[in-house]
Design a protein with these regions (language model features):
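Juxtacatalytic substrate-recognition/specificity segment
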Residues: 22-154, 160
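Beta/coil-rich, acidic/histidine-enriched accessory regions frequently appended to metallopeptidases
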Residues: 26-37, 213, 240-358
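Outer-membrane beta-barrel translocator/channel fold
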Residues: 369-370, 504, 523-527, 543-546, ...
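C-terminal outer-membrane beta-barrel translocator/porin domains of Gram-negative envelope proteins
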Residues: 690, 698, 707-709, 756-911, ...
Length: 968
């Protein structure tokens, strides 16, 4: 029976592992704060009190869009809670099961378009709630009664992720004036690549990504296919795909069958038709070239991105550079030769840099020390003279730093949704300029000629530019649903990116003449203009990436192209598509009257954390440990029942199981984890099975083995509690972690009573009368520290990194038990070629104190399983001066980018060659002697994607072959 259950679990894992990776997700804990909830007939808003206003506004948008959000599907959105996280600058949103909820990161995205962030989130994420509701029908709904929400997740296999995201981007686009899918940059990579649809190789690379080349993500791909299918068939094809799949989940490849059954098509045909049509449309557009002169060359097969170029004198440029081989770093480019040098590596940059007097300022995303859902935007700086990146103290909520001679300005974002422009003159006091409520700031610039600060604003009217001072915010341009970006200023002009012409181009606004001009003409796009002597520095895009370029500007502005104000950009690069008959969220206004009316209709109540810690969302008719299955990939199944719980705040997880097998009888297990205070607490308890014995063995006078007699075993039980303090120190290019832990465990194991041993002629004379003591306590303390650098797209391990840890374990109740002390260290080093990796590791452990035989052997001792030579188990070693070493060399050997179409796509094959060596003192016939074991061999590792899952769901499969040897 257990073998059959295990086989069933493996088959389910093969079918659903990738989708589970996206949906079985622990979001991470927020810092401690007070929470409230608003319940309506359709949704429940759960939010910290600091964002009560944002929660009310978001609820208003949800209720406004609800009648239309299910457009094209036969069922509307499911009833689902929305959980808001206000202290994470890495803006995002997710809809997931286990438990069912919508997660909103409320900090507006830095790189956004002309629709306010909360409207974007509602239009996109609430559409996922529609998809989930249409998949949770028929057989899938029946499975949810058997398995809880785990049963509903099986329905997610019946609609591809790229289709779900593409349909959600369509919703986001159709519920706005000029939304995400219509942005020129959203199709730019495909336009630059050319013949995507005629690619006759395995098309899975376009769905699953590549290590060879840059591939647009599944949002961009999904939108193009979904929008074409709507136009081609005149309806939402995914409605029937979801309907068929939810009622026939036992059919292999439900998407393929449904598309063939209802539309006489398939994914390959849709893909090729989509991009054939797009290419024909793009080829019909007037051909244009780049007016800007490139300053850098881009290599083949290493998609390169230069960002935010800034002038450094007359002969050099400072820019941020990233490519597939290396992470982001600041480089200095010689304008005359195109040569460059690296100045310093950075962390994940959040907003564009600024430079004055040889110092570069920028901001980076930095996770807080304790809480995963507190991610700051940290102000950083670097002097070009020494190239050392530094962190500015107490500047964690900073955006758009702007250096301007004696003044330095930045934008502060408060978790309650308010933006403030802060200006400091030298060492003087700060001046703070508040911005209007319900507006977002997406840029800051200082103009030396008008001696004023300017901001880029997004609100219900779209995007516009304003001047800010102590009297408030004064509009310079009118609001329009035209995306503006990367605001800079100088010489009486504002410079920024704009999509007014239908492509991303560099624009400027003459503050004296009050006129807007287009500076560039581009084949695909020009970005991030910055004024330089006699011209403008910017980046242009082509199939190889973003390159630094320079646009010369005539002194009389005769080369500038006047721009006529408009509420919408030219829809140039998108083929005609019929719009949905849905509400345009750009026309929805949340007023004070709406706030008062909603507060009266739906009152907020305190959301108590303790009563909501337990939230049983799933159950299974088998007994297993889900923590071990996820963390250690260990699946031990028994007949029985398992309940799984996770609270909506992602601060507590738990499971309880009852199982039975014929060897051990009834088995009861409980596991609880809590993360809400920064310290992680783990509680585990078990009951059932046979009591464990820690008994003695010896030899009689003839050398034959003699074992201690055991009484009949009782039922086994154990309980354990541990606490771990993970401290996270993110410092740009380096991420350091310090972990402190303490744990206690008690079990009713039967331990040999060593105090009653009698020795005669070097052997135990009363081994059958020694007896046992019930109960085994284990207390452990540990500390670990690691430091690793960021990994590039093609890296298989960090180029540099190290880990050190030390642990101490003892039994406080039984002095006959030896204490265990152990140390471990490992290091990552670069190999002989790019993306080759060397891993070396070493460990030492030994037992100290406790009862020892005359030979020196400690019969009662603990062991660490860290670094046991491959091919051996912990039963083969003794924790007596145990020393082990390991060395591995790993390298990529092939990027096949092929496989079985739509089933498995192999992206990369890696080879690892390794060897292990260990030695320790063990008891022998002549007393304690050194024993040595070793192993050599290798691993073949396949990086693959199953069932056209996106690049983020890449998995690994490893084949290992090692030759162990006792060595002597």
């Amino acid at each position: 029976m257990r073998r059959q259950l295990l086989l069933l679990a493996l088959l389910c894992a093969l079918c659903g592992a990738e989708r589970a990776a996206a949906q079985y997700y622990t979001w991470g804990s927020d810092p401690p704060q007070k929470w409230s909830a608003i319940r309506t007939p359709d949704v429940r808003m759960i939010y910290p009190d600091t964002v009560a206003g944002i929660a009310r506004r978001t609820l208003f948008y949800i209720r406004s869009v609800r009648p239309d959000i299910g457009y094209g599907f036969r069922h509307g959105p499911m009833r689902i809670p929305f959980v808001m996280h206000p202290e994470n600058f890495q803006s995002n949103g997710l809809v997931m099961y286990l438990p069912k909820r919508v997660e909103f990161l409320t900090s507006p995205a830095v790189d956004s378009y002309s629709m306010p962030w909360y409207k974007q989130l509602v239009a996109h994420e609430y559409r996922h709630a529609v998809q989930y509701n249409n998949l949770d029908r028929g057989v899938i709904r029946a499975l949810s009664y058997v398995l809880g929400q785990q049963g509903s997740t099986i329905g997610l296999l019946c609609m591809p992720i790229w289709a779900m995201e593409g349909d959600a981007v369509m919703s986001e686009t159709m519920h706005s004036s000029f939304g995400r899918g219509l942005q020129p940059s959203f199709s730019m990579a495909y336009r630059a690549m050319g013949s995507v649809g005629r690619d006759r190789r395995n098309i899975d690379r376009w769905f699953c990504g590549s290590y060879r080349d840059y591939i647009p993500d599944h949002y961009e791909l999904g939108y193009q296919i979904c929008s074409y299918a709507w136009e081609r068939y005149g309806e939402n094809i995914w409605d029937k795909v979801a309907w068929y799949g939810s009622r026939n989940p036992y059919v292999l490849a439900t998407t393929r069958v449904a598309l063939g059954k209802f539309y006489k098509t398939n994914v390959i045909k849709l893909f090729r038709e989509t991009f054939d049509e797009l290419e024909r449309y793009w080829d019909s557009l007037p051909e244009t070239g780049d007016s800007a002169v490139p300053l850098t060359a881009l290599p083949e097969k290493n998609h390169t991105t230069y960002q935010w170029p800034l002038p450094l004198g007359d002969t050099a440029v400072v820019a941020l550079k990233t490519d597939l081989d290396r992470v982001s770093r600041f480089v200095v480019i010689d304008r005359r030769t195109g040569g460059e040098r690296t100045v310093c590596h950075t962390g994940l940059v959040s907003t564009r840099p600024s430079m004055a007097d040889g110092r570069v300022w920028w901001t980076e995303y930095r996770r807080s020390t304790l809480f995963e859902q507190r991610v700051n935007s940290q102000l950083c700086y670097m002097d070009l003279a020494d190239g050392v990146p530094r962190t500015a103290e107490r500047q964690r909520n900073t955006l758009y730093p702007t250096a301007s001679g004696e003044e330095f300005g930045w934008v502060e974002y408060n978790p309650d949704g308010r933006y403030t422009v802060v200006v400091r003159h030298g060492e003087g006091p700060e001046r703070r300029f508040e911005t209007p409520v319900r507006s977002e700031i997406h840029g800051l610039a200082w103009d030396d000629r008008t001696v004023a600060w300017y901001v880029l604003v997004t609100d219900d009217s779209g995007m516009w530019i304003g001047r800010i001072d102590s009297d408030g915010l004064h509009p310079i341009t009118e609001g329009a649903y035209i995306t503006l970006s990367n605001l800079r200023a100088g010489g009486g002009k504002l410079y920024y990116g704009s999509i007014a012409s239908g492509r991303d181009e560099a624009h400027c606004y003459d503050l004296m003449a009050r006129r807007e001009y287009r500076i560039t003409t581009s084949a695909y796009g020009s970005f991030a203009p910055a004024p330089a002597d006699g011209g403008v520095l910017l980046t242009t895009y082509d199939r190889l990436g973003y390159r630094v370029a320079e646009q010369r500007v005539a002194a009389d502005d005769s080369l500038l192209i006047p721009v006529t104000p408009s509420r919408l950009p030219v829809n140039l690069v998108n083929p005609p598509r019929k719009r949905w008959d849905v509400v345009n969220l750009d026309t929805v206004r949340y007023t004070r009257a709406d706030s008062v009316g909603q507060s009266g209709e739906f009152r907020a109540k305190r959301y108590r954390k303790v009563p909501n810690l337990v939230n049983a969302h799933s159950w299974m008719p088998v007994a297993f440990n889900p923590f071990a299955a996820v963390d250690e990939h260990v699946i031990d199944l028994n007949v029985g029942l398992t309940l799984i719980s996770q609270n909506l705040l992602s601060s507590a997880e738990a499971y309880a199981s009852y199982g039975w097998n014929r060897h051990e009888g009834s088995l009861v297990n409980l596991g609880v984890r809590y993360f809400g205070l920064g310290v992680r607490f783990d509680l585990d308890a078990s009951y059932g099975g046979n009591q464990l014995f820690y008994s003695l063995a010896g030899r009689d006078g003839q050398g034959n083995p003699v074992y201690q007699s055991r009484p009949a075993p009782d039922k086994y039980y154990s309980v354990g509690l541990s606490a771990t303090l993970p401290l996270y120190f993110q410092r740009g290019y380096h991420t350091r972690q310090l972990s402190l832990s303490a744990g206690w465990n008690y079990s009713n194991g039967m331990v040999a009573d060593l105090g009653k041993i009698e020795w005669e002629n070097g052997s135990i004379s009363n081994i059958q009368r020694v007896g046992f003591r019930e109960g085994l306590h284990k207390v452990s303390f540990g500390a670990g520290f690691s430091d690793q650098v960021r990994m590039a797209h093609r890296d298989i391990a960090p180029r540099w990194g190290y880990t050190f840890s030390a642990n101490y374990t003892f039994n406080p109740e039984n002095t006959h038990f030896s204490d265990l002390i152990s140390f471990y260290g490992q290091a990552y080093l670069p190999g002989f070629a790019p993306h080759n990796s060397v891993l070396v590791a070493a460990t030492y452990q030994t037992s100290i104190g406790g009862y020892k035989f005359p030979s020196g052997y400690a019969p009662l001792s603990y062991k660490s399983t860290r670094l046991v030579p491959r091919g051996f188990t912990s039963a083969d070693i003794v924790s007596n001066n145990y020393t082990a070493f390991q060395a591995n060399y790993q390298l990529p050997v092939w990027y096949p980018e092929g496989g079985i179409g739509s089933v498995i796509y192999i992206k990369r094959i890696r080879l690892n060659a390794g060897g292990d060596y260990a030695q320790f003192r063990d008891v022998g016939r002549g007393g304690m002697t050194w024993r040595r074991i070793w192993s050599v061999g290798g691993d073949i590792v396949f990086d693959f994607n199953a069932f056209r899952q996106p690049a983020s769901a890449t998995s690994t499969f490893k084949l290992s072959c090692y030759h162990p040897s006792s060595g002597g």
